[in-house]
């Protein structure tokens, strides 16, 4: 599988099957991956192979770059369907994630009020109150949950710190339905399912 490391802080727009014309917002360094999972299927590669040397983009850098891109798109197109927080790892790790969400909402309302704001996250930071509240304010709060099987999570998602699926599931309930949970599909054989 080819490895993709995204520019920072803004990339695209790209055409997404699920989301439409998507302008990417990468809150992580542009030269590597920073994530609380080390998934075997990650398009950004393994954490150990792509450790960033550059710093995180600042809140101001993100806001300025996003505004410049949105101004350009308002003059020249294309019209974005969605502004998507994704990129080189887990976006909610950024220490100013909540403030950046507020900035993004204000800029979206100014330039493309019909565009949605999406966050693609692995849900490991939803216990931080400021992250939880920020995720409640986006249009598409997309929190990955590959399975509720702890063994599978350890083998495939490979959390880099404390991770208890039962705690995550309980916290997901606190979103009261304002969450999208994509589930991955894995080919299993009958002996695997029965074991």
List the predicted regions and their residue ranges.
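Short, charged low-complexity linear segments at domain edges
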Residues: 2-27
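Glycine-rich S-adenosyl-L-methionine
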Residues: 159-174
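Canonical Radical SAM [4Fe-4S] cluster-binding loop centered on the CxxxCxxC motif
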Residues: 18-61
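Canonical radical SAM enzyme core domain
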Residues: 52-67, 92-137, 145-150, 159-163, ...
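Short Fe-S-cluster ligation motifs
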Residues: 65-84
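Single conserved hydrophobic/aromatic residue that forms the stacking wall/gate
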Residues: 187-195
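A structural motif corresponding to the C-terminal end of an alpha-helix
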Residues: 111, 171-179
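Hydrophobic faces of well-ordered beta-strands that scaffold small-molecule active sites
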Residues: 23, 117-119, 141-143, 179-181
């Amino acid at each position: 599988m080819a490895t993709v490391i995204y520019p920072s802080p803004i990339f695209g727009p790209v055409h997404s099957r699920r989301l439409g014309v998507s302008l990417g917002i990468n809150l992580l360094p542009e030269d590597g991956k920073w994530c609380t999972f080390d998934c075997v299927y990650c398009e950004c590669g393994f954490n150990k192979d792509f450790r960033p040397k550059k710093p995180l983009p600042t809140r101001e850098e993100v806001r300025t770059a996003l505004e410049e891109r949105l101004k350009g798109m308002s003059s020249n197109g294309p019209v974005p369907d969605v502004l998507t927080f994704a990129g080189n790892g887990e976006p909610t790790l950024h220490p100013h994630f909540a403030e950046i969400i507020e900035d993004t909402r204000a800029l979206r309302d100014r330039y493309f009020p019909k565009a949605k704001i999406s966050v693609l996250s692995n849900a490991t930071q939803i216990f931080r109150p400021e992250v939880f509240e920020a995720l409640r304010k986006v249009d598409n709060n997309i929190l990955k949950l590959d399975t509720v099987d702890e063994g599978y999570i350890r083998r495939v998602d490979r959390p880099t710190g404390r991770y208890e699926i039962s705690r995550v599931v309980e916290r997901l309930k606190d979103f009261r339905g304002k969450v999208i949970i994509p589930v991955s599909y894995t080919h299993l054989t009958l002996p695997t399912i029965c074991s």
